[in-house]
Amino acid sequence: MNRNPDQNTLPNITLKIIETYLGRVPSVNEYHMLKLQARNIQKITVFNKDIFVSLVKKNKKRFFSDVNTSASEIKDRILSYFSKQTQTYNIGKLFTIIELQSVLVTTYTDILGVLTIKAPNVISSKISYNVTSMEELARDMLNSMNVAVIDKAKVMGRHNVSSLVKNVNKLMEEYLRRHNKSCICYGSYSLYLINPNIRYGDIDILQTNSRTFLIDLAFLIKFITGNNIILSKIPYLRNYMVIKDENDNHIIDSFNIRQDTMNVVPKIFIDNIYIVDPTFQLLNMIKMFSQIDRLEDLSKDPEKFNARMATMLEYVRYTHGIVFDGKRNNMPMKCIIDENNRIVTVTTKDYFSFKKCLVYLDENVLSSDILDLNADTSCDFESVTNSVYLIHDNIMYTYFSNTILLSDKGKVHEISARGLCAHILLYQMLTSGEYKQCLSDLLNSMMNRDKIPIYSHTERDKKPGRHGFINIEKDIIVF
């Protein structure tokens, strides 16, 4: 049975803060559970809701003007959410409401509200690239890798896209300019900034405050549309979150990285936006072609990949002076797979100071072996490479999260061999090491190649963990 707390024995100020917030005298249990949240609760209580309503309306006018909703509906939704706690008696749900309201009152203005004020002048920094000259070369490279056999009986997961993506993209373009120290983009949109002929869907981003940003954005969409918005966390993707609507339609996703990782990611500046250096993106594309699913994507839409590949090839030609003459020297580097222990040995002595690289296909095994080495100098680049790297006694140790394709029993397919080489080169770029000669040889090794069928492939490392989510409507946070 709930009893009101004895006001003579409890701190009156804290009690009053909680009482004002709940719109009722708290029970003894509510008081003792919420008293440590008094500071956050007070910030929520004194928060100027009128200014917040005005900011959301301005965001709506600028980025969601085609959404049919009135100013009064937006205001009602906001005021309703900020009074939701008065009708909530479950302690867990109250904690969720306090946490999410706290994010809004402390961060929304700086993260999304700022997008409504006049922006700095855009510094035009585009270079004219002759992408057309690379299209035939890109097509030849991709054609030799178009070797996946599509299983028509295989049920593919559908990726439903929300109609709000175009609105969010418009917002993201401005967000990337205003927050270019903490948020950068990669993928199709970043290449579109170099080559306007590139088609893109949603905008792929890396940022240092992903969770806060996505919560603020989810509430903005909720207040404008009235839809229930859900944030999901996927266990096998590091520090990844996605916003979906109540019908499971994809709106936007984001990877979170540390600031020290952000600082070392190679990037270039275009129109006040930082994008991941296309050289780095090209290496990632080569690496990802070792993933059987990505080769299946290539088989379905080769022209989409061709436009991207040609753009990146032209960028590296222009930026690094790469000559495409077919001289590949020792590329791809020799790769020998131990299928039982799931380790690939790459001979690196022709290019780097370390003589070989041991590439683990199971991350937990690598972690265990690094502990056994008693070495504490490993580099973890989080979702940028999906791997740690360690150089110890002239040997590199790293993890490869993709499948390994085989062209025959026990023989690594050249597509995967190049992917492994690209994975090593990502480390070189991130640590400001030498990579240009190796890059030149790697790209030239992709020229004038015949198609080699896939004999089989290794399975990807299985990641443990559970899906997490934030359900705003139901006041649930599970992480």
Curated annotation (Swiss-Prot):
Keyword hit for Transcription: yes
Catalytically driven reaction(s): RNA(n) + ATP = RNA(n)-3'-adenine ribonucleotide + diphosphate
Gene3D superfamilies membership: Poxvirus poly(A) polymerase, N domain, Poxvirus poly(A) polymerase, nucleotidyltransferase domain
Record-annotated active site: 202, 204
Entry annotated with the keyword rRNA-binding: no
GO molecular function: ATP binding; metal ion binding; poly(A) RNA polymerase activity
EC code(s) of this entry: 2.7.7.19
Induction description: Expressed in the early phase of the viral replicative cycle.
Chain residues that bind Ca(2+) 2: 202, 204, 253
GO terms, biological process: mRNA processing
Keywords, ordered alphabetically: ATP-binding, Calcium, Early protein, Metal-binding, mRNA processing, Nucleotide-binding, Transcription, Transferase
InterPro entries in UniProt: PolyA_pol_cat_Poxvir (IPR004976), PolyA_pol_cat_sf (IPR037265), PolyA_pol_nucTrfase_Poxvir (IPR024231), PolyA_pol_nucTrfase_sf_Poxvir (IPR038419), Poxvirus_polyA_pol_cat_C (IPR024397), Poxvirus_polyA_pol_cat_N (IPR024398), Poxvirus_polyA_pol_cat_N_sf (IPR038337)
Binding site for Ca(2+) 1: 202, 204
Top-level EC class as recorded in UniProt: transferase
Oligomeric form and interacting partners: Heterodimer of a large (catalytic) subunit and a small (regulatory) subunit.
Protein family (similarity comment): Belongs to the poxviridae poly(A) polymerase catalytic subunit family.
Function statement: Polymerase that creates the 3'-poly(A) tail of mRNA's.
Annotated protein name in UniProt: Poly(A) polymerase catalytic subunit
Organism of origin: Vaccinia virus (strain Western Reserve)
Name of encoding gene: OPG063
